[in-house]
């Protein structure tokens, strides 16, 4: 039995369109917005009752206002808030919009609905560009160069909000009417809203139902009835009057707090993790220096010509699986900024069955995830899709494909505020006043209040981070010249390795896992192993490529080293002093369930983003958003439990409790 909802639990909205072209939910039998004027209703119920015209105009540079919403629907409320923000707020202010939607509209329905509001065309076009690869869970969409962020939680609101880590400044309590959707309008919802609210948070809602008003008051909001809009005689507005201050139950995972005054950072390492970190910080107004020991970015693990968007999923709702789904969707949206065909290809990925254990695993995955993300194909259908003969079918990921990692790195580094410093090898770190100095062979390379270690396994080369349990695993790819017949391959094929359709006339094949060898020269043995793997994937493709295991000396290839952690999850977040950590939480060594409220001894301004292993194309881009959220105290782009599972302090905690 899997712990994910069955695939039928995820369902797009089913709409009926009336004679005026307005949408109505078939499931709930309710409208998405006022038939009189949805735009004016939004302005009155949500923008005005939350005092957003004044609040946006009063925002300071680098300030971020967070809006929470309980029903995304057509996106009308989001687009109206975004438009008002653009018109009213200072250029360096930011808007973060968190919304929940159980039944998202299909792209076609969203496009049709937004066409009703030509006044919002500028914002609507950007939303539609990013409205792809939306899957259950946390979805991060970025607009206006990072000035506007949408965190869309796809699922039931009563299941999504408890996992959210955010501080909401203004609430849009929206959704279908309480009489139409009573499952949502529960005391548990009002309690979660209070928990997530920043001090003095405001609230607007279209309903004036007495039980809603009483429930919000009981949760800590001061509520009042005010004149409604259109046929609504009254609506509700309110603000958080009282909330119970909660001590962090896991202080070792608590946010370090915003102690940095000057928004400058140094990122060590210009691979995908480092470039994504730099881009996320620059989008928030930080000035970032990226130190790279090579002549350019993406020269090591992120330097392969083709990286596959391969989703290694679990049917059991693991932290890694949630990270993979959220990360995949985010990467897929980023790739839309690159040149299709040259820098990436949305050709899909076909994961082939190769033994009975894999057959069972795939059956569980097909049941656990919606077909829009992954669906099974019998052999005949798989062959027709792939364009080559196969011995088995498998699982097809239609939104996946391959990408050229260096192109994504270069695009990420183009953001204003980022400086790439080449031929700068960081050898040491030292604290200097309120800043960190990064030292090289010739002295100080850079200095800033924040340093992010993003250099794969070399993140552990410094005294402050030497305890990080990182491991290097050699991987070799083989480059096979395409033939007229091999070029008919139309999708990425995966089994125990992968082969991609050609890029620049070459197929990428790989990659080996070599735990012993530590040099970076391609080996004949690993070329031969890659060719054997290709033959297992498709004998037909093997023959079309005229692959010859006796002529591997002539093959081109590339070696890089994956960086992994003991639990195969990345390390993303702030670093603590290991000795002081052990002292602060020593009681946990005697009783792991004991409540300890000591403040975590952070190494102020020192962060890490590494150990993405063979999933870098999936997890590294989103990791930049997660690290920036830790730094800027913004809503996390992943469920809290997933962020904790990626937190570096998990290893200090395990060592304390288990002694290992």
From Swiss-Prot:
It is found in: Cytoplasm. Its EC number is 2.1.1.61, 1.5.-.-. Residues 268-660 are annotated as: FAD-dependent cmnm(5)s(2)U34 oxidoreductase. The keyword Kinase does not apply. It catalyses: 5-aminomethyl-2-thiouridine(34) in tRNA + S-adenosyl-L-methionine = 5-methylaminomethyl-2-thiouridine(34) in tRNA + S-adenosyl-L-homocysteine + H(+). Keywords: Cytoplasm, FAD, Flavoprotein, Methyltransferase, Multifunctional enzyme, Oxidoreductase, S-adenosyl-L-methionine, Transferase, tRNA processing. GO terms for cellular component: cytoplasm. Disulfide bonds: none annotated. GO terms for biological process: methylation; tRNA wobble uridine modification. InterPro entries: FAD-dep_OxRdtase (IPR006076), FAD/NAD-bd_sf (IPR036188), MnmC-like_methylTransf (IPR008471), SAM-dependent_MTases_sf (IPR029063), tRNA_MAMT_biosynth_bifunc_MnmC (IPR023032), tRNA_MNMC2 (IPR047785), tRNA_S-uridine_synth_MnmC_C (IPR017610). Its cofactor is FAD. One of its GO terms (molecular function) is oxidoreductase activity, acting on the CH-NH group of donors. Residues 1-241 are annotated as: tRNA (mnm(5)s(2)U34)-methyltransferase. Catalyzes the last two steps in the biosynthesis of 5-methylaminomethyl-2-thiouridine (mnm(5)s(2)U) at the wobble position (U34) in tRNA. Catalyzes the FAD-dependent demodification of cmnm(5)s(2)U34 to nm(5)s(2)U34, followed by the transfer of a methyl group from S-adenosyl-L-methionine to nm(5)s(2)U34, to form mnm(5)s(2)U34. In the N-terminal section; belongs to the methyltransferase superfamily. tRNA (mnm(5)s(2)U34)-methyltransferase family. This is tRNA 5-methylaminomethyl-2-thiouridine biosynthesis bifunctional protein MnmC. It comes from Stutzerimonas stutzeri (strain A1501) (Pseudomonas stutzeri).
């Amino acid at each position: 039995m899997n712990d994910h909802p069955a695939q039928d639990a995820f369902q797009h909205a089913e709409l009926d369109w009336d004679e005026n072209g307005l949408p109505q939910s078939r499931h709930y039998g309710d409208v998405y917005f006022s038939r009189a004027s949805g735009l004016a209703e939004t302005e009155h119920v949500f923008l005005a009752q939350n005092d957003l015209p004044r609040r946006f105009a009063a925002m300071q540079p680098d300030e971020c206002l967070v809006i929470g919403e309980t029903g995304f629907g057509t996106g009308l409320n989001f687009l109206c808030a975004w438009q008002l923000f653009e018109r009213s707020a200072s250029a360096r202010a930011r808007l973060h919009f968190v919304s929940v939607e159980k039944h998202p509209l299909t792209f076609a329905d969203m496009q049709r609905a937004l066409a009703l509001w030509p006044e919002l065309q500028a914002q609507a076009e950007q939303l539609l560009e990013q409205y792809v690869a939306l899957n259950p869970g946390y979805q991060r969409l970025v607009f206006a160069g990072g000035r506007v962020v949408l965190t869309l939680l796809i699922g039931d609101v009563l299941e999504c909000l408890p996992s959210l880590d955010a501080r909401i400044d203004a609430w849009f309590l929206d959704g279908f009417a309480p009489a139409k959707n009573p499952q949502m309008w529960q005391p548990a919802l009002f309690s979660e809203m209070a928990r997530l609210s920043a001090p003095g948070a405001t609230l607007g809602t279209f309903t004036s139902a007495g039980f809603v008003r009483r429930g919000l008051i009981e949760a800590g909001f001061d509520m009042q009835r005010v004149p409604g809009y259109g046929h609504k005689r009254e609506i509700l507005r309110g603000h958080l009057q009282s909330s119970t201050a909660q001590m962090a139950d896991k202080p070792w995972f608590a946010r370090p707090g915003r102690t940095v005054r000057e928004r400058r950072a140094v990122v060590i390492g210009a691979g995908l993790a480092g470039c994504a970190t730099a881009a996320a910080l620059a989008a928030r107004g930080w000035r970032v220096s990226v130190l790279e020991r090579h002549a350019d970015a993406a020269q090591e693990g992120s330097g392969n010509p083709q990286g596959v968007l391969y989703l290694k999923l679990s049917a059991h709702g693991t932290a890694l699986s949630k990270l993979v789904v959220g990360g995949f969707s985010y990467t897929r949206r980023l790739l839309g900024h690159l040149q299709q065909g040259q820098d990436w290809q949305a050709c899909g990925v076909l994961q082939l069955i190769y033994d009975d254990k894999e057959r069972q695993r795939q059956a569980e995955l097909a049941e656990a995830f919606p077909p829009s993300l992954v669906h099974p194909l019998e052999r005949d259908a798989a062959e027709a899709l792939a364009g080559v003969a196969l011995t088995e079918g498998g699982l097809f990921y239609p939104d996946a494909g391959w990408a050229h990692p260096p192109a994504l790195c270069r695009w990420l580094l183009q953001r204003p505020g980022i400086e790439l410093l080449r031929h700068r090898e960081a050898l040491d770190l030292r604290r200097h006043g309120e800043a960190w100095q990064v030292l090289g062979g010739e002295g100080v390379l850079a200095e800033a209040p924040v340093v992010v270690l993003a250099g794969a396994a070399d993140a552990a080369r410094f005294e402050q981070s030497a305890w990080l349990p990182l491991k290097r695993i050699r991987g070799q790819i083989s480059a096979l010249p395409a033939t007229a017949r091999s070029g008919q391959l139309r999708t990425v094929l995966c089994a125990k390795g992968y082969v991609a359709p050609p890029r620049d006339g070459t197929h990428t094949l790989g990659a080996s896992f070599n735990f012993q060898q530590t040099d970076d020269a391609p080996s004949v043995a690993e070329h031969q192993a890659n060719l054997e793997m290709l033959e297992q994937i498709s004998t037909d493709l093997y023959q079309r490529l005229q692959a010859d295991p006796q002529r591997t000396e002539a093959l081109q290839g590339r070696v890089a080293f994956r960086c992994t952690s003991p639990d195969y999850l990345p390390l993303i977040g702030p670093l603590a002093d290991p000795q002081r950590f052990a002292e602060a939480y020593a009681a946990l060594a005697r009783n792991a369930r004991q409540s300890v409220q000591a403040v975590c001894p952070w190494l102020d301004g020192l962060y890490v983003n590494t150990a993405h292993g063979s999933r870098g194309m999936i997890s590294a881009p989103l990791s930049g958003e997660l690290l920036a959220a830790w730094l800027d105290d913004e809503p996390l782009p992943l469920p809290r439990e997933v962020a904790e599972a990626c937190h570096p302090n998990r290893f200090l905690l395990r060592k304390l409790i288990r002694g290992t």
